């Protein structure tokens, strides 16, 4: 599951615009029993090996989330006796794609990882740790959800259940690869602790479909865009994980294709006015969350030679065009007004963060936040109410496996 469904708390800005290298070595290995929302861990890693404090997980609107759903309703949706719209032949084709396991031998590390990590220093090192932490947490949350769906649907619809199980395999592989990467920075996430300690956010099945489809597709466009950029600009290739993004993004794409098939099998989620409203809502939620988070991490994108806002808008536009093939309505993200409002939200969010960093008592902070939250809500509503693009159709050609680049 891509990071956009489980984004994290904004971090402090840094002025670094390119990788900083040194020959320093880093000390003790630390197991971290927390999410990436804790800055103390990352700072300890950046400084080189002080044991990080085991702080509590802090929940915000932009914090990584683990999801659960109504599994009984899921079973009813995929019961072939109840739902005659299920296209089992399409699911069978998708199952064969997942069974092929194109990336079975792809995620193999080499000595480049540790050597590159030892050369990354200062603010960029801190940001790489946060990138790995939040990405690992997001992939692991997808693993848990898909694994449980695979288990619960085994009797109701074995084909769909097996696809979910194979997707959990992919997510576990991604999370493990990222967590191993943290060892290059002398850290590791305690995923077992995360499983027990995290709060789970409940989403109805149809919301899981909307949000996860967008998450997987936006993940594809993020990964392939970074991969293409670094292939053309190898001087910014400061850590080898990016070399794996070309194949990695195809896992995200296949997962998105599966959720597209799930939506087509439930036309009630696509063919009425409520579906149009929810489609626009989830597009807005995913796009805004990504934009706000990334604009608080410009040092990461600048460190690999990208302009953060240009990168995000490219990803949003491409994701929106892909999403328009299945969602009944999408946002008009290519309207200049859309980006203008995103940038305004970034300004408001920065003011909110600044309030949180003051030494004022909690009551005063909350009073200062009220007008800012109202302004942010106003911008969100105005963006949501922009004239949408009518789109989508459930009249698709038969599924044909293909790579998309």
Curated annotation (Swiss-Prot):
Transit peptide: 1-43
EC category: oxidoreductase
UniProt catalytic activity: Mg-protoporphyrin IX 13-monomethyl ester + 3 NADPH + 3 O2 + 2 H(+) = 3,8-divinyl protochlorophyllide a + 3 NADP(+) + 5 H2O
Enzyme Commission designation: 1.14.13.81
InterPro entries the record matches: AcsF, Ferritin-like_SF, Rr_diiron-bd_dom
Names of required cofactors: Fe cation
GO cellular component: chloroplast thylakoid membrane
Similarity comment: Belongs to the AcsF family.
Function noted in UniProt: Catalyzes the formation of the isocyclic ring in chlorophyll biosynthesis. Mediates the cyclase reaction, which results in the formation of divinylprotochlorophyllide (Pchlide) characteristic of all chlorophylls from magnesium-protoporphyrin IX 13-monomethyl ester (MgPMME).
Name of this chain's protein: Magnesium-protoporphyrin IX monomethyl ester [oxidative] cyclase, chloroplastic
Organism from which the protein derives: Gossypium hirsutum (Upland cotton)
């Amino acid at each position: 599951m891509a990071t956009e469904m489980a984004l994290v708390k904004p971090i402090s800005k840094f002025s670094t615009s390119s990788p900083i290298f040194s020959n320093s070595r880093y000390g003790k290995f630390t197991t971290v029993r927390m999410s990436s929302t804790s800055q103390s861990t990352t700072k300890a890693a950046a400084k080189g090996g002080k044991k990080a404090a085991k702080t509590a997980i802090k929940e915000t609107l932009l914090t990584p989330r683990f999801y659960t759903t109504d599994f009984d309703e899921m079973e009813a949706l995929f019961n072939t006796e109840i739902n005659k719209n299920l296209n089992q032949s399409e699911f069978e084709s998708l199952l064969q794609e997942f069974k092929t396991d194109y990336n079975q031998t792809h995620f193999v590390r080499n000595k480049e990882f540790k050597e590159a990590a030892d050369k990354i220093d200062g603010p960029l090192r801190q940001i790489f740790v946060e990138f790995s932490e939040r990405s690992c947490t997001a992939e692991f949350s997808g693993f848990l959800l898909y694994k449980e769906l695979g288990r619960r649907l085994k009797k109701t619809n074995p084909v769909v259940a097996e696809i979910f199980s194979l997707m959990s395999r992919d997510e576990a592989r991604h999370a493990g690869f990222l967590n191993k990467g943290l060892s290059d920075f002398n850290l590791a996430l305690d995923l077992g602790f995360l499983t027990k300690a995290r709060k789970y956010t409940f989403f109805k099945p149809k919301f899981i479909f909307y949000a996860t489809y967008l998450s997987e597709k936006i993940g594809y466009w993020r990964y392939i865009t970074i991969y293409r950029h670094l292939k053309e600009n190898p001087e910014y290739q400061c850590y080898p994980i990016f070399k794996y993004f070309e194949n990695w993004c195809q896992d995200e794409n296949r997962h998105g294709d599966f959720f597209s098939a799930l939506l087509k099998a439930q036309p009630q989620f696509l063919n009425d006015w409520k579906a149009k409203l929810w489609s626009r809502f989830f597009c807005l939620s995913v796009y805004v969350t990504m934009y706000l988070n990334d604009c608080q991490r410009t040092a990461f994108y600048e460190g690999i030679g990208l302009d953060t806002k240009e990168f995000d808008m490219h990803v949003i536009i491409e994701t929106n065009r892909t999403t328009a093939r299945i969602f009944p309505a999408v946002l008009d993200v290519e309207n200049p007004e859309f980006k203008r409002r995103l940038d305004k939200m970034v300004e408001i969010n920065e003011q909110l963060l600044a309030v949180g960093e003051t030494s004022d008592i909690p009551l005063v902070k909350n009073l200062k936040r009220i007008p800012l939250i109202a302004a942010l809500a106003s911008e969100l509503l105005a963006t949501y109410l922009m004239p949408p693009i009518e789109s989508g159709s459930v009249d698709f050609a038969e599924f044909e496996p293909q790579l998309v680049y």
